[in-house]
Design a protein with these regions (language model features):
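Active-site catalytic microenvironments in core metabolic enzymes, especially phosphate/sugar-handling
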Residues: 1-263
Length: 263
């Protein structure tokens, strides 16, 4: 089937764009679309990405600090949770001596110059490093801007696997399961034994997401929804959490709406 689709696309000069785990892990991606269909709010990533953040530190003349910060933020820096434009700024003094053939922004060639500068620190996703460095070089007034990039061990809470969120109001387990069945047009869904609790906090993962069951339980979710759960995954969690399997395709069927909105 896949091969036939590829051949037909090539014959008709159609471009194919394929997104898999990148869209699974992205903010606004597969899991966010599922959460939207269910009606969840206060969304958080179940398993944040590790080793995906870096810190940028640069030094800018006081008079140009605002322009550099704005350029860095526009390029993707400074996002922490529900906050943007985040940075730390410390005033200090930079020194340099411009050699022959240079065109210094301030100071004279051959003379040691002292300039009041601001140390700007901010964070960014590692995949945006190239774009951010280009933005920095484009706006920084110095010919040779000084900047440092550090790897961070912080989890990137804005991207990762799975989502956990809350319903506006609690539902019984049967009410919730019936609504999920209708929303995702599922002929038959599987679930473990009902826990007897009402459903308010919901964890989910599109596709084969059973690997996130421990995280869903730790999050305090009342139910975990995913596309595939293996037979043995159902055992050992009786009374802990309601687990329901709606089908791999069914869980991701609304992903096309994401691309519709972009295109």
């Amino acid at each position: 089937y896949v091969e036939r689709c590829m051949l037909k696309a090539i014959k008709n000069d159609i471009v194919i764009y394929s997104a898999h785990t990148n869209l699974d892990n992205a903010q606004g991606g597969v899991n966010y679309k599922i959460a939207e269909k269910i009606g969840l709010k206060n969304l958080k990533v179940l398993e944040p990405k590790e080793n995906s953040l870096i810190k940028l530190v640069t030094f800018v003349p006081n008079t140009k600090a605002d322009a550099v910060r704005e350029a860095l933020f526009a390029a993707g820096c400074g996002n922490i949770g529900n906050y943007d434009s985040c940075s730390y700024n410390l005033e200090g003094e930079g020194t340099f001596r411009a050699k022959e053939g240079t065109h210094p922004f301030c100071g004279a060639i051959g003379e040691l110059h002292r300039e009041g500068e601001v140390r700007i620190e901010t964070i960014l996703p590692a995949f945006k490093k190239s774009a951010v460095v280009r933005a920095l070089l484009a706006v920084h007034p110095y010919e040779e801007p000084a900047f440092d990039i550090y790897p961070l061990q912080n989890d990137w809470t804005q991207a990762g696997s799975g989502i956990v969120g809350e319903l506006d109001k609690s539902e019984t387990e049967l009410e919730f399961l019936k609504r999920i069945k209708k929303t995702f047009e599922v002929g038959c869904l599987r679930h473990n034994k009902l826990t007897g609790r009402e459903i308010r906090k919901v964890a989910l993962c599109g596709g084969a997401g059973a690997f996130l069951l421990p995280q869903a339980i730790r999050s305090g979710a009342d139910v975990f929804i995913t596309g595939e759960i293996k037979y043995h995954d159902y055992f050992g969690h009786e009374g802990e959490i309601l687990m329901t399997e709606i089908g791999h395709y069914e869980s991701e069927q609304y992903t096309k709406e994401i691309f519709y909105s972009i295109i």
